A protein has these predicted regions:
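Nudix hydrolase/Nudix homology domain
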Residues: 2, 6-7, 71, 82, ...
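Active-site-adjacent beta-strand/loop module that shapes the phosphate/pyrophosphate-binding cleft
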Residues: 22-27, 111-133
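Conserved Nudix-box catalytic region and its N-terminal flanking loop in Nudix hydrolases
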Residues: 33-39, 45, 53-92, 96, ...
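A short coil-to-beta-strand element that immediately follows conserved catalytic motifs
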Residues: 3, 101-108
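Short helix-loop capping/hinge motifs at secondary-structure junctions, enriched
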Residues: 30, 51-53, 131-133, 180-181
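Acidic, metal-coordinating catalytic segment for phosphate/diphosphate chemistry
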Residues: 7-45
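Short beta-strand micro-motifs in enzyme catalytic cores
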Residues: 17-21, 57, 71, 121-123
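Short, well-ordered beta-strand micro-motif
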Residues: 20-22, 46, 126-128, 147-149
Length: 181
């Protein structure tokens, strides 16, 4: 287990912070590690149709991502606000990005995004019993919402059309562990 000896903040921004931690490693050596501190996030797989149907419809986003060099397919997601629960965040992001509201929000799992340099965790959910509405994206979000059958979404993962890690994990977790596909 690593033990933190000291932390030095080198950057603090709107979304994240960067620290240089001096840590004692399991072998008792002392290391300096750059750590991206993130408040955490939630992501949600919205099922437009009954999850028990043979091929449920999934709402996907085609969202412009500067870091990815353009638009990519993903599930709705966003950063936890201070004091906000992961489920509340998932519900908020679902409504903001798709316009939908969920009667049911079920927890799937929690993942570390890149534990080699960040403490970011994303809490994954599946939403069902949706009522649709108009998306209300933030001013820096450029996205389109599309419904696709889950079979097509899984094919998009196989064909590398969906390359966003949180979305792949959430969709495959849902298909494999919740729906038994």
């Amino acid at each position: 287990m690593r033990q933190c000896i000291a932390t030095r903040r080198v950057y603090s921004g709107r979304l994240l912070r960067v620290d240089v931690d001096t840590v004692r490693a399991p072998d008792e050596s002392v290391l300096e590690l750059e750590m991206v501190r993130h408040p955490g996030a939630a992501a949600v797989v919205p099922l437009l149709s009954d999850p028990e149907s043979p091929d449920p419809q999934v709402l996907l986003l085609r969202q412009y991502r500067y870091a990815a060099g353009g638009p990519i397919w993903e599930v709705p997601a966003g950063v936890l606000e201070p004091g906000e629960s992961p489920e509340t965040c998932a519900r908020r992001e679902l409504t903001e990005e798709t316009g939908a509201r969920a009667e049911h929000m079920d927890y799937l799992t929690t993942i570390f995004t890149t534990p080699g340099f960040t403490d970011e965790k994303i809490h994954l959910f599946v939403a069902s019993g949706l009522t649709t509405g108009a998306p209300q994206p933030m001013s820096d979000e450029f996205l389109e919402v599309e419904a696709r059958p889950l079979s097509k979404v899984l094919q998009m993962i196989r064909d590398q059309e969906i390359v966003d890690a949180k979305s792949i994990v959430a969709l495959l977790y849902l298909a494999g562990f919740k729906l038994g596909l």
